[in-house]
């Protein structure tokens, strides 16, 4: 069988550690589950998913890997789609579970694509850059707290499961990875979710600035004063000082009283 060659421009670091693959699969009940895998690479993790899941659909952008995967998994409960997940139309109706080892350079884009389609998924397990994992689970008033933290925690109950070292991949990345679990919330409103993402993105547009100096880019002084008076904010408060519940209330206040 032809040996896959990792492509640097696609950010390919193929998982090769059996213990890590087993650990990922052990963290979720895959029985009768239909799985979406984003970028199955050599099919290393795919093999473990197929052992337990009902069906696996894999989005793989690298066309050179397709014949290798098709030969490796012939007659398996697997559908391989040679397409960029970021461009894919997600037309399925029943909720799926996503499990993936994501390329570092497009992690945020893929996350926000998933978040924009939150109604189509129930659980997500992702291998990401360790630094990104820390941002996903970050708490207010910490250096890693960001719009990604808010979006992730608005959409789901999130948990950083474990760190994965460079030796678990080929080729070895220069940094650690981590596996993060998302248990998606079931009571979300699509319109309010979209509004929340938009509003928090605006609030974190310039992270080094105060909240006021972020809001001034899309609100006038009177509107900001109305917000500050209602929430009794200090003038110098910064975006990273406010928790998720406050941002939910802020977004609701903006769209109900100002927008």
Curated annotation (Swiss-Prot):
Binding site for S-adenosyl-L-methionine: 13, 15, 39, 60, 84, 101
Alphabetical UniProt keywords: Cytoplasm, Methyltransferase, RNA-binding, rRNA processing, S-adenosyl-L-methionine, Transferase
EC number: 2.1.1.182
Domain of life: Bacteria
Subcellular location field: Cytoplasm
Gene3D superfamilies on file: Ribosomal RNA adenine dimethylase-like, domain 2, Vaccinia Virus protein VP39
InterPro entries given in the database record: KsgA/Erm, rRNA_Ade_diMease-like_C, rRNA_Ade_Mease_Trfase_CS, rRNA_Ade_methylase_Trfase_N, rRNA_adenine_dimethylase, SAM-dependent_MTases_sf
GO CC annotation: cytosol
A Pfam short name: RrnaAD
Catalytic activity annotation: adenosine(1518)/adenosine(1519) in 16S rRNA + 4 S-adenosyl-L-methionine = N(6)-dimethyladenosine(1518)/N(6)-dimethyladenosine(1519) in 16S rRNA + 4 S-adenosyl-L-homocysteine + 4 H(+)
MF GO annotations: 16S rRNA (adenine(1518)-N(6)/adenine(1519)-N(6))-dimethyltransferase activity; RNA binding
Protein's job: Specifically dimethylates two adjacent adenosines (A1518 and A1519) in the loop of a conserved hairpin near the 3'-end of 16S rRNA in the 30S particle. May play a critical role in biogenesis of 30S subunits.
Protein family (similarity comment): Belongs to the class I-like SAM-binding methyltransferase superfamily. rRNA adenine N(6)-methyltransferase family. RsmA subfamily.
Protein's name according to its UniProt entry: Ribosomal RNA small subunit methyltransferase A
Encoding gene per record: rsmA
């Amino acid at each position: 069988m032809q040996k896959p060659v990792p492509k640097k421009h696609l950010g390919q670091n193929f998982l090769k550690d059996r213990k890590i693959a087993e650990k990922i699969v052990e963290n979720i009940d895959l029985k009768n589950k239909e799985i979406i895998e984003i970028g199955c690479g050599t099919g290393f993790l795919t093999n473990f998913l197929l052992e337990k899941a009902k069906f696996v659909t894999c989005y793989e952008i690298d066309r050179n890997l397709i014949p290798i995967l098709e030969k490796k998994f012939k007659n398996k409960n697997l559908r391989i789609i040679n397409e960029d997940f970021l461009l894919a139309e997600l037309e399925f109706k029943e909720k799926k579970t996503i499990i993936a080892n994501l390329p570092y350079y497009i992690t945020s884009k893929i996350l926000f694509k998933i978040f924009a389609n939150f109604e189509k998924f129930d659980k997500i397990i992702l291998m990401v850059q360790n630094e990104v994992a820390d941002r996903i689970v970050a708490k207010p008033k910490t250096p890693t707290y960001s719009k990604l933290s808010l979006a992730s925690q608005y959409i789901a109950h999130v948990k950083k499961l474990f760190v994965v070292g460079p030796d678990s991949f080929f080729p070895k990345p220069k940094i650690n990875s981590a596996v993060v679990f998302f248990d998606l919330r079931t009571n979300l409103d699509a319109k309010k979710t979209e509004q929340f993402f938009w509003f928090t993105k605006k609030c974190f547009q310039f992270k080094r600035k105060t909240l006021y100096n972020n809001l001034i880019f899309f609100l006038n002084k009177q509107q900001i004063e109305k917000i500050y008076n209602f929430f009794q904010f200090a003038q110098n408060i910064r975006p990273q000082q406010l928790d998720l519940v406050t941002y939910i209330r802020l977004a609701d206040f903006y769209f109900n009283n100002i927008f």
